A protein has these predicted regions:
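Catalytic core of membrane glycerolipid acyltransferases/transacylases, capturing the structured
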Residues: 1-34
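Non-catalytic C-terminal accessory region of glycerolipid acyltransferases
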Residues: 38-167
Length: 167
């Protein structure tokens, strides 16, 4: 799952990005949330129901300062709807390898640390999916990632911080 903007670029660079992300199995998500992200969540559910895996970054964007920000609840919703476990992954070193604005990654190493699965009971009706339950599961994911990565956790959405920084 990747931001929809990767699939909407113009010119040769835009076409290349769309081709690249599509060829490696990335599908677009409208990160503005709510009903606008439903087609991506539907696609993700279909992948999980086939017994396959996919990745989702709960922050929804790159961290503006290397800290770990509040997660969005899409992964929790998918887990509740499908009963699939969530495997938290801390990815370390990407900030140094490809700082924002660089086109070609620098040489270096990244590390992926896999956490213990978070098992969620599948629910049978939308009434069982409460905001509180979604937040509880999402917070468990971000706590696990923070523990593995050593990142400071910020209880605020990264996009909100980015917007404030650009004012």
């Amino acid at each position: 799952m990747g931001k929809a903007e990767y699939f909407e670029g113009k010119g040769l660079k835009g076409r290349f990005k769309k081709w690249w992300f599509t060829s490696v199995g990335v599908f677009p998500v409208d990160r503005s949330g709510g009903a606008r992200s439903e087609s991506a969540l539907k696609h993700a559910r279909a992948i999980l129901e086939k017994g396959q895996l996919f990745g989702i970054h709960v922050e929804g964007t790159r961290s503006p300062d290397g800290r770990l920000y509040k997660g969005h609840t899409g992964a929790a919703r998918l887990a509740l709807e499908t009963g699939c476990p969530i495997i938290p992954v801390a990815i370390i070193g990407t900030r140094q390898l490809q700082p924002k604005g660089t086109v070609i990654p620098l040489s270096g190493k990244t590390q992926a640390i896999y956490g213990e699965p978070i098992h969620v009971e599948r629910v049978t009706s939308d009434e069982e999916i409460t905001r509180e339950r979604l937040r509880e599961i999402t917070d468990a994911i971000t706590r696990s990632i923070a523990s593995m990565s050593g990142q400071e956790y910020v209880d605020e959405y990264a996009q909100t911080v980015k917007q404030r920084m650009n004012e």
